Amino acid sequence: MDQQRFTHLLQLEAESIHIIREVAAEFSNPVMMYSIGKDSSVMLHLARKAFHPGKLPFPLLHVDTGWKFREMYAFRDHTAKAYGFELLVHKNPEGVAMGINPFVHGSAKHTDIMKNEGLKQALNQYGFDAAFGGARRDEEKSRAKERIYSFRDRFHRWDPKNQRPELWHNYNGQINKGESIRVFPLSNWTELDIWQYIFLENIEIVPLYLAKKRPVLERDGMLIMVDDDRIDLQPGEVIEQRMVRFRTLGCWPLTGAVASDAQTLPEIIEEMLVSTTSERQGRVIDRDQSGSMEMKKRQGYF
């Protein structure tokens, strides 16, 4: 690909860098959420560009559920060491003490306690007044109507009917004590934009995004990769090796793989050009009930 043919990516890059710099200048204690996925990798790359040759003026925060893929943990630690940024890792201690897990307690309770409550705990503990997230509007309908600067009250709740206008790239970050802003620099990017940018900028990603023979089982119409011995096999389920990759990454028991032969970035991009389904079709948490993502966001989720 010739970078000069992708001027829209340069425009998206410039917009995102402007937003990141704006937040760093406007807020007293910002943080960048780091979920280890492709969007986080792009957002981190943009942040490093925004402040090059200096260091990032804010830490990265990973809210750990204890159920991420092993390759994700390895990639997280490798990336933090390679780039030398401050990495904060928070795991909900109450959830750990209760032994919360997706097999016993289900996806909704696991997500609420380990991700949603864990996130709010970390934001309160460190007193962050702004938090960057890698969500994009093309991912899901509730995210499609959310502003780039997403106002949250002192309980971290989002009210879609109480959003601020964003005219001519002017963002309103005025908040009272205890309130905060969630910031989405990648709002206007698409999944295809993300992959093209990763290719053009040679951004390192978790290998799980590339197709490979992996141990999977079929459950509720999804291909679940068996990542460790905590798997709870149901009667009739069989683990088999299949060529699969992931379009989105989360907790391994709650994230479905897709059958694919795309082992390189150009092959992934080719897949994206003909895809007619959302990348979040592989997320069990989005299937909990109708409008489940918006409900989670109203309660404090990203």
UniProtKB/Swiss-Prot annotation:
InterPro entries hit by this protein: PAPS_reduct_dom (IPR002500), Rossmann-like_a/b/a_fold (IPR014729), SO4_adenylTrfase_ssu (IPR011784), Sulfate_adenylyltrnsfr_sub2 (IPR050128)
Pathway annotation from the record: Sulfur metabolism; hydrogen sulfide biosynthesis; sulfite from sulfate: step 1/3
One of the record's GO molecular function terms: sulfate adenylyltransferase (ATP) activity
Catalytic reaction equation(s): sulfate + ATP + H(+) = adenosine 5'-phosphosulfate + diphosphate
Entry keywords, A to Z: ATP-binding, Nucleotide-binding, Nucleotidyltransferase, Transferase
Family assignment from sequence similarity: Belongs to the PAPS reductase family. CysD subfamily.
Function, in words: With CysN forms the ATP sulfurylase (ATPS) that catalyzes the adenylation of sulfate producing adenosine 5'-phosphosulfate (APS) and diphosphate, the first enzymatic step in sulfur assimilation pathway. APS synthesis involves the formation of a high-energy phosphoric-sulfuric acid anhydride bond driven by GTP hydrolysis by CysN coupled to ATP hydrolysis by CysD.
Name this polypeptide is given: Sulfate adenylyltransferase subunit 2
Gene designation per UniProt: cysD
